[in-house]
Each structure stands twice: as structure tokens, then as C-alpha cells.
Amino acid sequence: MTHPNRTTPRPATVVRCALLVSALVAGAAACGSGGGHPLASRPYDATGQVVFAGLPGDGRKADPDKPLEITVKDSEGPLTDVTAVDATGRFVAGELAADGRRWHSTEPLAANAHYTVRVSTEDDDGAPGRRVLTFDTGAPVSKKRLEVTFGPDAGTYGVGQPITATLSRPVKDPAQRAVVERALKVDSTPSVPGAWHWVDSKELHYRPKDYWPAQARIRVHSHLDGIKIGDRLWGAKTPDLNLKIGDKVVAVTDASSHWMTVYKNGEEINSIPVTTGKPGFETRNGVKVVLGKEYNVRMRGTTVGISAGSSESYDLSVYYATRVTWSGEYVHAAPWSVDSQGSANVSHGCTGMSTGNAAWFYENVREGDVVKVINSYGDDMEPFGNGFGDWNVTWKKWQEGSALTTKKGPQGDTSRLQPTMV
């Protein structure tokens, strides 16, 4: 492509302001105040200067398995910026070569997507050029899909409720995990810092650095639909999940003093005499989260490894049972131990209280509320697998469980990553 008044290239004076993400998003191309500077002119049509490799030119859909590559013709001026975005607002990450003559995508294109690509160039005088291209990608050849199920169910929860993402297939490769995690978004109002943590190859948990703010609203959504995750594996569509957070309710049980103190939005609202696990059956220390409530539960010692007929054997009908672990730890009514409540630990691991106090607790907590045990001789609460012990993991360790974390620290949201010079 020929432009009038070309002179010998002046690479030392080339101004490259199009790499500013804010300028791209706003559609602005100026980084000066005009006054005759070449960049103050209207961008020329760079159609003859830019080559899109791998895109069919006959109206056929592009193969989502192939990367997007953009180059400039020989003797033409360099690329200064490239953005590629689909109809849902997902940006494609890419790299711009140091000499400005080639840009290529560094993450897969989505299948069945409509893309708009905006290319910025300049001529030898530094005058800006622009080309815009749209194209569609076709369906993936493979039928293998990765489905994601978000949890918990829609509803209102306590400030300790983690978000879960359960995968239909195991994902073990670190690069594939990064693709999956980058596509799973959690937005909250008010906004708070948070991160995903890979529990295993099929489950991720998300939590904020601290508990959710009281009365927060949370939206969980996936951009994985149509995204290539690995060889012959593509993301499937996932419904959004919307949650509400209620009041901040935290119950702290001191096993050494045999009392539970309940706080609501930072204010003490009740103090309850309790009994916790006796020697050999000590209650777990640490932060737990309410998993559910059952008005009546049959509790048998055989379900926790106590032999039938032994001196520790029991078979009881228990009321106002608030579950905090899957292995059978509850806060519940224990009328048979009222004389010990507030003075001794005589249970098999549960937190027992009078029927009246248990009914009050049952009515004033919800799933996701925090139940913390301190000063027990029991083991520490497991982070995963026995309820939600997520809050017993330090924030630093939690971030290390993200696939987007490097030795330099956790990466930010890269869904809008712009091209970088290499």
C-alpha cells in the first residue's frame, strides 16, 4: 500500500500509544493534543497492509482449533495494536512481536462465536492506520464437553458460604486448569477480593479473603461455553448462579470454658452453656460452616465407629440438630447432659445444649453461617471433604491453590488481557 510523502522510516520517533487499553476500549487513537502531529490525523484504511492468516475468505466459518494470526506485508509499516473480542465481550489474549510485524493469539478461540478484530498500524511517517474485520468460528469437531455445576443452590446464605464448581471430567493439566479457572467468574456487590482454589481435579472452591460482607449479592457465571480446554475437550454452557448473603452470624464455642457466644453483625446476641467432646471424642478445633438443619435426627454410635453394646454405644433421637460436618458433628439439643453444660465436656464430639437453647440456635442460624470452636483438644477441622473448612486455610495458601498463581504471586483477571510486546 502506497501513501504520499513517505520518508525514510524514523523508528526512534515512532509514538505507540495504541497499546493503551483504555484508549482501545474508548475507541480513541490520540495521545497528544494534535497541532499537526501525524497521529492527530484520521486513520488511513490499512486493508492492503494487513494480512489475516488462516481465515477463510469465502464466507466459511473459521476453525476454532487454529490460532488467529495477523501480519503486515513486506515493506509496510508495523502493527501497533490488535484487539479481538467476541460478541459476549470476551477478549482474546495475544502477543505482538517486538518488531511489530506479527501478532498471534495465545489462547484458544471460542467455537460458534462471532469475533470483531481491530488492528492498528502506522506508516513510515507515524500516521495511524486502522482495519476492522469480523468473522465467525464453526463448531468443534470433538463432542467431548466439560460441564460445570455451580453450588450451592440459589438462595440466601451466611457470610462463610464458599462457592463450589464441580466439573464433569477431571482436569489435571496446569494449562488446562488455567483455561477453566479463567472462565469462571464471581462478581459480588460490594466487591471484595477472592480466588478459586482447586480442591482436586474435579472440584474448585471460591471464597473471599475474609468473610463475605453482610447483605452482599453474588453472581457466579462461566465464559467456558465454546472454549477449547485441551485436545478434543471443549467447554459447555453453564447457567448463572445468583446468591444473597444475610446478616453476619458467627458462633464461637470455647471448649475450655464450655460456653458458646453468638454474634450478629459484630454484636453479641446470646451466650449459651454447652458441652463438647470428652476425652477420646474431642470436638474439632477451627472454623466450620452450617451445612444444614434437621429438626429430628437419629444418632447412633455405630455410624462413627463405636461398637454396638460397648460402654460408649448410643442410639438417640435428637432434636434441633444443626449440622457442621458431613461426618456427623452437630450443634443440637442434649437434655440428658444439662447438668454438665457450662462445666464439663461429656459428648461424643457434638456441641450439646439445652432444648430451649438448641431451638433458639436452630431458628437463628442459616446455611453458611460460621461456627468456630476454640481451645479444644481435638484435631483441627479439615479444609475439605468434611464440610466447609475452607476458612482454616490462610489466604496465602488459598491463593497458591489457584491455577492462575505464579511464583511472583497470583495473576489478576486476564479475561481482558491485551497484546503485549515480546
Descriptions of predicted regions:
Residues 121-123, 224-226, 266, 296, ...:
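Short, charged beta-turn/beta-strand-edge "cap" motif at the junction between a beta-strand
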Residues 159, 285, 297, 301-422:
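Exported/periplasmic cell-wall-interacting domains
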Residues 229-339:
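Gly/Pro-biased beta-strand-loop elements
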Residues 69, 116-118, 132, 164, ...:
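Extracytoplasmic/secreted envelope proteins and their assembly/folding machinery
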Residues 60, 107-110, 155, 159, ...:
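Extracytoplasmic/periplasmic, Sec-exported soluble proteins
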Residues 124, 140, 213-214, 284, ...:
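A short, structured loop/turn motif at beta-sheet edges
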Residues 2-28, 32-247, 274, 412-415:
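Acidic, low-complexity Ser/Thr/Gly/Pro-rich repeat segments typical of extracellular/periplasmic
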